[in-house]
Amino acid sequence: MKVLLANPRGFCAGVDRAIEIVECALKLHGAPVYVRHEVVHNKFVVDGLKNKGAVFVEDIADVPNNQVVIFSAHGVSIAVRRQTHNIGAIIYDATCPLVTKVHKEVARKQKQNYQVILIGHKGHPEVEGTLGQSSESNCVQLVETIEDVERLNLSKNMSFSYTTQTTLSIDDTQSIIDYLKLRIPTIDMPKKDDICYATQNRQDAVKILMQFSSVLLILGSSNSSNSNRLREIAEKIGIPAYLIDGIDNIDELWFKGVDTIGVTAGASAPEVLVQEVVHYLRDKGATKVIEVGGVKENIHFPVPKELR
């Protein structure tokens, strides 16, 4: 039995930065520090930070006055930002810079009187944050499917632009974009695709891996958007794919009659979990572990200067 490891996999620059911000804040201020939402969507990472003194909350109303508050990598709305300032918090923003870019684009388009169409998953914290960048509730319309595009209320006197959640499936997003262009030929496009580099690279790596694998294991938590997209890509190709938090979630029956197992990790899953899976598979009879070539990533996002 062979094990193929996707490249790139695991932590991206935005996740590295977000975790480092929490750890630096704990070192500077001591526990507790409050984090609005899970800083990244990974159980192993979140549990580790909890053990160091991070307190994760969904509502700023649950934070006492004058405490340290960190915004998660997914970003927050203007209203949440304002609410946090109002309780006298010391604020550190761990929003991924690529998400911040989308936020700034929404604000810029609003000032130019554009109606913004956001392609994303309803209820995802990144989407909630992006929707909340507009001071007008009807400035941004959310679409998830081509059917949503068909139902859009389009004013003839309005200019339109679109943007996307950064962690979507590239293929699925493109079909929605194509339909948007069909419905609104004059729609304004982002200067560059909003799907982040790490999302694209990890999806491309899975497509390569699937050419040689009989089953795919994806290290990633169930609430991780980018990890779920990796699973969906494999399943659309016709390869069984399993999203796991770690080796405790593995079922040996998945490998019955299988000679090649692909392994990857979502952008919020640490490499230590991948290596635990590799050791597990070696113990179960894997004789070869092969790193499959892919794009080399050298992007780094620095933490805020006050934490350096």
Swiss-Prot record:
<feature type="active site" description="Proton donor">
    <location>
        <position position="126"/>
    </location>
</feature>
<feature type="binding site">
    <location>
        <position position="225"/>
    </location>
    <ligand>
        <name>isopentenyl diphosphate</name>
    </ligand>
</feature>
<feature type="binding site">
    <location>
        <position position="225"/>
    </location>
    <ligand>
        <name>(2E)-4-hydroxy-3-methylbut-2-enyl diphosphate</name>
    </ligand>
</feature>
<dbReference type="GO" id="GO:0046872">
    <property type="term" value="F:metal ion binding"/>
</dbReference>
<feature type="binding site">
    <location>
        <position position="268"/>
    </location>
    <ligand>
        <name>dimethylallyl diphosphate</name>
    </ligand>
</feature>
<feature type="binding site">
    <location>
        <position position="226"/>
    </location>
    <ligand>
        <name>dimethylallyl diphosphate</name>
    </ligand>
</feature>
<feature type="binding site">
    <location>
        <position position="226"/>
    </location>
    <ligand>
        <name>isopentenyl diphosphate</name>
    </ligand>
</feature>
<dbReference type="GO" id="GO:0051745">
    <property type="term" value="F:4-hydroxy-3-methylbut-2-enyl diphosphate reductase activity"/>
</dbReference>
<keyword id="KW-0411">Iron-sulfur</keyword>
<feature type="binding site">
    <location>
        <position position="225"/>
    </location>
    <ligand>
        <name>dimethylallyl diphosphate</name>
    </ligand>
</feature>
<dbReference type="GO" id="GO:0016114">
    <property type="term" value="P:terpenoid biosynthetic process"/>
</dbReference>
<feature type="binding site">
    <location>
        <position position="224"/>
    </location>
    <ligand>
        <name>(2E)-4-hydroxy-3-methylbut-2-enyl diphosphate</name>
    </ligand>
</feature>
<feature type="binding site">
    <location>
        <position position="268"/>
    </location>
    <ligand>
        <name>(2E)-4-hydroxy-3-methylbut-2-enyl diphosphate</name>
    </ligand>
</feature>
<feature type="binding site">
    <location>
        <position position="166"/>
    </location>
    <ligand>
        <name>(2E)-4-hydroxy-3-methylbut-2-enyl diphosphate</name>
    </ligand>
</feature>
<feature type="binding site">
    <location>
        <position position="196"/>
    </location>
    <ligand>
        <name>[4Fe-4S] cluster</name>
    </ligand>
</feature>
<keyword id="KW-0560">Oxidoreductase</keyword>
<feature type="binding site">
    <location>
        <position position="74"/>
    </location>
    <ligand>
        <name>isopentenyl diphosphate</name>
    </ligand>
</feature>
<dbReference type="Pfam" id="PF02401">
    <property type="entry name" value="LYTB"/>
</dbReference>
<feature type="binding site">
    <location>
        <position position="74"/>
    </location>
    <ligand>
        <name>dimethylallyl diphosphate</name>
    </ligand>
</feature>
<protein>
    <recommendedName>
        <fullName>4-hydroxy-3-methylbut-2-enyl diphosphate reductase</fullName>
        <ecNumber>1.17.7.4</ecNumber>
    </recommendedName>
</protein>
<feature type="binding site">
    <location>
        <position position="41"/>
    </location>
    <ligand>
        <name>dimethylallyl diphosphate</name>
    </ligand>
</feature>
<feature type="binding site">
    <location>
        <position position="12"/>
    </location>
    <ligand>
        <name>[4Fe-4S] cluster</name>
    </ligand>
</feature>
<dbReference type="InterPro" id="IPR003451">
    <property type="entry name" value="LytB/IspH"/>
</dbReference>
<feature type="binding site">
    <location>
        <position position="124"/>
    </location>
    <ligand>
        <name>(2E)-4-hydroxy-3-methylbut-2-enyl diphosphate</name>
    </ligand>
</feature>
<keyword id="KW-0414">Isoprene biosynthesis</keyword>
<keyword id="KW-0004">4Fe-4S</keyword>
<feature type="binding site">
    <location>
        <position position="41"/>
    </location>
    <ligand>
        <name>isopentenyl diphosphate</name>
    </ligand>
</feature>
<keyword id="KW-0408">Iron</keyword>
<feature type="binding site">
    <location>
        <position position="124"/>
    </location>
    <ligand>
        <name>isopentenyl diphosphate</name>
    </ligand>
</feature>
<feature type="binding site">
    <location>
        <position position="226"/>
    </location>
    <ligand>
        <name>(2E)-4-hydroxy-3-methylbut-2-enyl diphosphate</name>
    </ligand>
</feature>
<dbReference type="GO" id="GO:0051539">
    <property type="term" value="F:4 iron, 4 sulfur cluster binding"/>
</dbReference>
<comment type="pathway">
    <text>Isoprenoid biosynthesis; isopentenyl diphosphate biosynthesis via DXP pathway; isopentenyl diphosphate from 1-deoxy-D-xylulose 5-phosphate: step 6/6.</text>
</comment>
<dbReference type="GO" id="GO:0050992">
    <property type="term" value="P:dimethylallyl diphosphate biosynthetic process"/>
</dbReference>
<comment type="pathway">
    <text>Isoprenoid biosynthesis; dimethylallyl diphosphate biosynthesis; dimethylallyl diphosphate from (2E)-4-hydroxy-3-methylbutenyl diphosphate: step 1/1.</text>
</comment>
<keyword id="KW-0479">Metal-binding</keyword>
<feature type="binding site">
    <location>
        <position position="224"/>
    </location>
    <ligand>
        <name>isopentenyl diphosphate</name>
    </ligand>
</feature>
<feature type="binding site">
    <location>
        <position position="124"/>
    </location>
    <ligand>
        <name>dimethylallyl diphosphate</name>
    </ligand>
</feature>
<comment type="function">
    <text>Catalyzes the conversion of 1-hydroxy-2-methyl-2-(E)-butenyl 4-diphosphate (HMBPP) into a mixture of isopentenyl diphosphate (IPP) and dimethylallyl diphosphate (DMAPP). Acts in the terminal step of the DOXP/MEP pathway for isoprenoid precursor biosynthesis.</text>
</comment>
<feature type="binding site">
    <location>
        <position position="96"/>
    </location>
    <ligand>
        <name>[4Fe-4S] cluster</name>
    </ligand>
</feature>
<feature type="binding site">
    <location>
        <position position="224"/>
    </location>
    <ligand>
        <name>dimethylallyl diphosphate</name>
    </ligand>
</feature>
<feature type="binding site">
    <location>
        <position position="41"/>
    </location>
    <ligand>
        <name>(2E)-4-hydroxy-3-methylbut-2-enyl diphosphate</name>
    </ligand>
</feature>
<feature type="binding site">
    <location>
        <position position="268"/>
    </location>
    <ligand>
        <name>isopentenyl diphosphate</name>
    </ligand>
</feature>
